[in-house]
């Protein structure tokens, strides 16, 4: 009898425990948000899996391609859900244009962060900061001083020296008849330029600093997809006392903190005559300004550099790699680029940044590569308030996901959207400034758009333009086989090549005495 009572009690306890857990899961994860379909005319929603909704689509290897198939079947504006978290998916240039034109302020926040205290996209991050006083202050500081025209002019020699160093390295490979992995060479170039522009120094190869930085950037990019899921589910998980992927995120953050703290200490020990010309000096001046519009902290400074290295390094590297891949698969484009550069620059000196405004075809080639291969194929935002888009109601706090990859291949606004045609970006192929403005806002989104568009896009164009221009001007290139394999892969949330681009440089103008 005692055994029976004990058995019944155990069963009862297990039943109650399961019931409570089920109730909690339902309440926190599966309960519909306040703005339900019964009360509002939401966009159409494709069939979803029980409980988890459409989460499986975000877990695919090529998320942008999975979402492209979904939108081609069900429409350009869709309502998705991850458990009970609402998401609006946009896959049309016209819908994207309407949102950026009418809801720019409303979508100027990216939502909550994955882990507040992390330097990697935490609460101190300029990239993930909500649209408020801190973000406005940092945007103004970035546009006016950190990446403004004067700052770019002051740092021009830094970029020119590293482009020359890049060229010398390729020249050495050409003499040895060795192939190079374009992505790795571009990564070295970007790391050197960004370190010198931001901190006035390059990280040392000897003591492993360079490798540490590259490793942290790679690790952070690898975490980005996890961070996106952590952000989506954070509000629900917080109620249960759970922080998704916190250990991984804080592990990378702490390593960045050690590296950047060392940089800050060493910079303070520099003589005053060596200070005042790089981004770190501008940020330290703002940090010490008691009358500043917003009082930033050391964590804000560190987080800015984390944003810079994660946001600018791999995106520019992939742009260089994809652009060279397209050039190699289209030899007539290489010939036209070379003719333009030889005509403007000549054959007695190396291409310079000041030449770039006079090289429209080079610029068009880079833009076309960005159109077909945007580094960040998905652009996340958050609707702060409820609004109407395309005749449908969008509830407040709904995540917005713009599939820039699909928007920039929209056949309704792009002629032959799957073909590599740089000519579409030449001024002669467009009519008037209004068309150009609409093109930028409506169709071309590799750097986002509106208030949250990338403030470093002009700098990226200068570095990528100088690098691509130099490689075209100075070298012929050989590949294994007839064509470059253009198969895509995604690293974190960055669109990259599944097979790294390997080319063999051949000196075009020996002995390149002007290098």
Swiss-Prot record:
Short name of any one Pfam family annotated for the protein: p450
Gene disruption: observed consequences: No visible phenotype under normal growth conditions, but mutant plants exhibit loss of tropic response to gravity when reoriented relative to the gravity vector in the cold.
Biological processes annotated in GO: gravitropism; positive gravitropism
Single GO term (MF): oxidoreductase activity, acting on paired donors, with incorporation or reduction of molecular oxygen
Keyword Iron set for record: yes
Transmembrane segments: 9-29
Residues that hold heme according to the record: 454
Record-listed E.C. numbers: 1.14.-.-
Membrane topology of this protein: Single-pass membrane protein
CDD domains, sorted: CYP93
Gene3D superfamilies found in the cross-reference section: Cytochrome P450
Subcellular location: Membrane
Keywords, ordered alphabetically: Heme, Iron, Membrane, Metal-binding, Monooxygenase, Oxidoreductase, Transmembrane, Transmembrane helix
Cofactor: heme
GO cellular component term of the entry, any: membrane
PANTHER family named among the record's database cross-references: CYTOCHROME P450 705A22, FLAVONOID 3'-MONOOXYGENASE-RELATED
Function, in words: Plays a role in the gravitropic response of the inflorescence stems and roots. May affect the synthesis of flavonols that have a role in regulating auxin transport.
Similarity-based family: Belongs to the cytochrome P450 family.
Protein name: Cytochrome P450 705A22
Gene source species: Arabidopsis thaliana (Mouse-ear cress)
């Amino acid at each position: 009898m005692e055994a029976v009572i004990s058995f019944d009690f155990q069963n009862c306890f297990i039943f109650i425990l399961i019931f409570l857990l089920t109730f909690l899961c339902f309440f926190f994860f599966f309960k519909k948000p306040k703005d339900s379909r019964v009360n509002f005319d939401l966009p159409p929603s494709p069939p979803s899996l029980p409980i988890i909704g459409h989460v499986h689509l975000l877990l695919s290897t090529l998320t942008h391609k999975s979402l492209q198939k979904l939108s081609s079947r069900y429409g350009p504006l869709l309502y998705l859900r991850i458990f009970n978290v609402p998401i609006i998916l946009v896959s049309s240039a016209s819908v994207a244009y309407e949102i950026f034109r009418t809801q720019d302020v409303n979508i100027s926040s990216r939502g909550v962060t994955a882990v507040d205290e992390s330097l990697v996209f935490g609460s101190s991050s300029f990239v993930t900061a909500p649209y408020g006083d801190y973000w406005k202050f940092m945007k103004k500081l970035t546009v006016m001083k950190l990446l403004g025209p004067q700052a770019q002019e002051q740092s021009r020699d830094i970029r020119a020296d590293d482009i020359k160093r890049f060229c010398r390295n390729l020249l050495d490979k050409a003499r040895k008849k060795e192939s190079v992995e374009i992505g790795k060479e571009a990564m070295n170039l970007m790391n050197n330029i960004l370190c010198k522009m931001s901190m006035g120094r390059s990280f040392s190869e000897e003591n492993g600093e360079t490798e540490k930085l590259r490793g942290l950037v790679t690790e952070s990019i690898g975490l980005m997809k996890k961070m996106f899921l952590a952000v989506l589910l954070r509000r629900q998980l917080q109620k249960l006392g759970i922080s998704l992927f916190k250990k991984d995120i804080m592990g990378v953050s702490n390593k960045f903190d050690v590296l950047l703290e060392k940089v800050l200490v060493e910079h303070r020990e520099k003589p005053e005559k060596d200070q005042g010309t790089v981004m770190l000096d501008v940020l330290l001046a703002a940090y010490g300004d008691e009358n500043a519009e917003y009082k930033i902290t050391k964590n804000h400074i560190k987080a800015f550099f984390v944003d810079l290295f994660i946001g600018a390094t791999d995106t520019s590297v992939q742009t260089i790699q994809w652009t060279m891949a397209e050039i190699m698969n289209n030899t007539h484009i290489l010939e036209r680029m070379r003719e333009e550069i030889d005509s403007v620059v000549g054959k007695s000196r190396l291409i310079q940044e000041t030449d770039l405004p006079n090289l429209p075809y080079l610029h068009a080639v880079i833009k076309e590569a960005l159109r077909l291969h945007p580094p960040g194929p998905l652009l996340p935002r958050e609707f702060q308030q409820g609004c109407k888009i395309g005749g449908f109601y969008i509830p407040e706090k709904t995540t917005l996901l713009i599939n820039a990859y699909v928007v920039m291949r929209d056949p309704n606004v792009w002629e032959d959207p799957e073909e590599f045609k740089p000519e579409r970006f030449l001024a002669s192929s467009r009519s008037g400034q209004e068309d150009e403005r609409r093109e930028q806002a409506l169709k071309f989104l590799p750097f986002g758009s509106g208030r949250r568009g990338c403030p470093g896009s002009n700098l990226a164009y200068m570095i990528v333009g100088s690098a691509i221009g130099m490689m075209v001007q100075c070298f012929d290139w050989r590949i294994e086989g007839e064509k470059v394999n253009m198969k895509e892969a995604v690293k974190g949330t960055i669109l990259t090549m599944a097979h790294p681009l390997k080319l063999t440089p051949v000196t075009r103008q020996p002995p390149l005495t002007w290098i």
